[in-house]
């Protein structure tokens, strides 16, 4: 086997050569393989929370917070040592840390050695196990990400409220099984998907309010090493943990954990992210269907191209992306469910490789979904002229349930009325499909049926009323608006958020 010289490897695809940059660790691999979710879709704020360099700084800040608390509680840690660590905190060299890890085969030990060498001291990590560092810092990343996603959720709900209000009285043809059903309004349809997301938003608030951090619990959860450091003084150990939790800014702390916090908590987090994405995904799937009928669209930016082959195409590519993000989140939810209920004794690291991928990428996915969805909500449009033509075509069918109720009120049995209306409706549809008629003449057919005690004028009036009758849709939209208004007042920063430009 002849190995190519470093930097000369080429991949041949249909006779086109693509040179790969040299990787210093392995000359056969490209230098950088990007995280597509982070690089292409996530916002800078989420990228910063989960970046490798950002995490190292968070870990160092955590070590410093522990040292300060330990010193305040009587441990012999010189002030100049803490100052030296603080001075070195932002000097991050991932390559140097990786070189140490290749020797130690232990990521935390490598980062301890790196930080100690930079500061010239050995005072970090006293009485701590690796999970005291990694679990708390990862939970801090999760918690800060949840807060960011909460604010973007408010931005989405704000736009849904505005769009629902804008089109509250625009009557459209509602569809069940994707078949014309009854009149509704576009505002009601938007509020329908908005209320689904509102329910998920309340679940998100609950997760944030009750999110428990692991705290300083030691190797198996008993705080044995911290108790040794403080000569068995349990009050000082609890005080230390309280100070560290205050540094993290978490609402509560686990008491009875082992080496790891329960992975069912990760499942809960990814579950609520998937729940949050479900309403937007259904909305976007429906908007794609509406675009196919030319009744609405997600918008089409100047210079945008729908197809490299078909110049006329204006595809719902952003809505499709939202649906794709939802699929990704459901994949990570499956990963999270695999970890929940799978803990051996006090814990191990079998979950580590899964969580390294699942946690950041789940947040990148929901963040990218919201950035895209906000853009859709800002740029979407509806087309009343096309909607009006669709309504006119289907309106006699859409009002058949009202006709049936009026017939019942006039004394006909419900099932008798149902049977008669169904016979004529199906016959009318079949004649329209076969080209035997070009006009929906259902009203005339019903008027000539003795089983229906309503004359043509009464039937025509019922159908005409359907042009503006969407039941209780307006009141239901108003209820949705009130709920969102209350949330906007609680989170004004979130309501004012504007998305960045999307690819």
Which role does the model predict for each range below?
Residues 243-259:
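A short, charged helix-loop
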Residues 379-449, 470, 482-486:
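C-terminal alpha-helical interaction appendages
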Residues 262-295, 304-365:
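A conserved active-site cap/scaffold subdomain adjacent to cofactor or substrate pockets
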Residues 47-51, 96-98, 304-324, 346-361, ...:
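Short beta-alpha connecting loops at secondary-structure transitions
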Residues 25-223, 230-245, 306-307, 317-321, ...:
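A helix-coil-helix interface module used to build multimeric assemblies
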Residues 1-28:
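N-terminal amphipathic/basic-hydrophobic helices that include classical n-h-c signal peptides
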Residues 328-412, 420:
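Long, amphipathic alpha-helical stalk/connector segments used for oligomerization, subunit docking
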Residues 60, 105-108, 153, 157-160, ...:
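Alpha-helical transition-metal enzyme core signature, strongest for iron centers
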């Amino acid at each position: 086997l002849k190995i190519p010289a470093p930097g000369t490897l080429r991949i041949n695809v249909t006779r086109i050569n693509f040179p790969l940059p040299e990787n210093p660790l392995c000359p056969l691999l490209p230098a950088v393989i990007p995280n597509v979710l982070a690089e292409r879709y996530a916002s800078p704020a989420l990228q910063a929370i989960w970046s490798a360099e950002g995490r190292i700084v968070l870990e160092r800040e955590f070590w410093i917070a522990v040292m300060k608390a330990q010193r305040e509680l009587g441990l012999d840690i010189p002030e100049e040592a803490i100052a030296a660590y603080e001075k070195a905190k932002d000097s991050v060299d991932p390559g140097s840390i990786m070189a140490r890890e290749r020797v130690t085969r232990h990521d935390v030990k490598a980062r301890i050695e790196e930080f100690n060498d930079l500061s010239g001291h050995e005072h970090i990590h006293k009485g701590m196990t690796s999970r005291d560092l990694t679990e708390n810092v990862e939970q801090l990343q999760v918690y800060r990400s949840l807060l960011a996603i909460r604010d973007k959720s408010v931005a989405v709900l704000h736009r849904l409220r505005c769009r629902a209000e804008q089109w509250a009285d625009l009557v459209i043809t509602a569809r069940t099984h994707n078949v014309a059903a009854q009149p509704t309004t576009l505002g009601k349809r938007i509020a329908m998907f908005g209320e689904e997301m509102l329910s998920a938003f309340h679940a998100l608030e609950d997760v944030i309010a009750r999110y428990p951090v692991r705290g300083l619990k030691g190797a198996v959860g008993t705080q044995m090493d911290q108790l040794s450091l403080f000569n068995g003084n349990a009050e000082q150990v609890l005080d230390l943990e309280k100070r560290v939790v205050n540094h993290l800014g978490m609402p509560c702390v686990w008491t009875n954990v082992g080496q790891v916090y329960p992975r069912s908590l990760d499942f809960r987090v990814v579950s609520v992210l998937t729940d949050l994405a479900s309403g937007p995904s259904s909305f976007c799937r429906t908007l794609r269907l509406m675009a196919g009928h030319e009744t609405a669209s997600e918008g089409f930016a100047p210079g945008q191209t729908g197809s490299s082959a078909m110049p006329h195409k204006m595809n719902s590519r952003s809505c499709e992306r939202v649906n794709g993000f939802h699929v990704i989140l459901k994949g990570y939810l499956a990963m999270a469910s695999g970890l929940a209920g799978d803990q051996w004794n006090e814990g191990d690291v079998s979950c580590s490789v899964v969580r390294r991928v699942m946690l950041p990428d789940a947040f990148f996915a929901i963040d990218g979904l919201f950035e895209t969805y906000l853009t859709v909500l800002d740029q979407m449009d509806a087309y009343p002229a096309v909607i009006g033509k669709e309504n006119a075509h289907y309106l006699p069918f859409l009002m058949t349930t009202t006709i049936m109720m009026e017939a019942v009120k006039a004394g006909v049995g419900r099932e008798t009325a149902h049977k008669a209306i169904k016979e004529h409706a199906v016959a009318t549809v079949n004649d329209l499909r076969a080209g035997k008629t070009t006009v929906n003449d259902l009203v005339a057919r019903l008027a000539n049926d003795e089983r229906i005690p309503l004359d043509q004028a009464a039937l025509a009036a019922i159908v005409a009323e359907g042009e503006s009758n969407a039941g209780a849709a307006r009141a239901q939209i108003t209820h949705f608006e009130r709920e969102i208004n209350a949330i906007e007042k609680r989170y004004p920063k979130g309501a004012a958020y504007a998305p960045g430009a999307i690819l």
